[in-house]
Amino acid sequence: MILGIGTDLCDIRRIESSLERFGDRFTHRVFTDGERGKCDRRAARGPSYARRFAAKEACAKALGTGMSQGVFWRDMEVVNLPSGQPTLNLTGGAREHLARMVPAGHEARLHLTLTDEPPLAQAFVIIEAVPITATS
C-alpha cells in the first residue's frame, strides 16, 4: 500500500548560488558526508547537489512532515543500490516518523527517481508498505 508520495522541482541555479555564497556552511548543513563526497567528485557539482536537494524535499513531503516535526535535512541521504538505482537512507527523526507510518506486519520500501534538465532538477519519492513474509 502507498503511504506517501512526494515530488519536488528545484532550480539548479539556486543551488549553485548557495554553493558559491555559503560553500561548506551550506553543504554541511544540508548534505551527509557521503552525499558531499559524491557531488564534489563531479565536474558539474550544481546539478548533482540540486537532484539530492529535490530528493530530500520530496521525501519530507512523502513523510507528510516537511522540514519539521523532528525531520532534518541530514536525516535523509540519497544513496545508490549496487545496481546504481538511487534510493534513500533515513536516520534520526525521518526514520522515526517513517516507523510510525508503517502498519504492523509491514515493512517500508522507499522508491526514488531523480532527473535534471537544466535549469531544473526533479525528484519523486513513493513510500510503500509491503507485508512482511516469513522466509523458509
UniProtKB/Swiss-Prot annotation:
Cofactor: Mg(2+)
Signal peptide stretch: none
Enzyme class name: transferase
Keywords from the UniProt entry: Cytoplasm, Fatty acid biosynthesis, Fatty acid metabolism, Lipid biosynthesis, Lipid metabolism, Magnesium, Metal-binding, Transferase
Binding residues annotated for Mg(2+), in chain numbering: 8, 57
GO BP terms: fatty acid biosynthetic process
The UniProt record lists the keyword Acetylation: no
GO cellular component: cytoplasm
Catalytic activity: apo-[ACP] + CoA = holo-[ACP] + adenosine 3',5'-bisphosphate + H(+)
Entry EC no(s): 2.7.8.7
Entry's Gene Ontology molecular function annotations: holo-[acyl-carrier-protein] synthase activity; magnesium ion binding
Keyword Phosphoprotein on entry: no
Subcellular location as annotated: Cytoplasm
InterPro entries hit by this protein: 4-PPantetheinyl_Trfase_dom, 4-PPantetheinyl_Trfase_dom_sf, ACPS, Ppantetheine-prot_Trfase_dom
Role according to the record: Transfers the 4'-phosphopantetheine moiety from coenzyme A to a Ser of acyl-carrier-protein.
Family in the record: Belongs to the P-Pant transferase superfamily. AcpS family.
Protein name, UniProt field: Holo-[acyl-carrier-protein] synthase
Native organism taxonomy: Bacteria, Pseudomonadati, Pseudomonadota, Alphaproteobacteria, Hyphomicrobiales
Gene: acpS
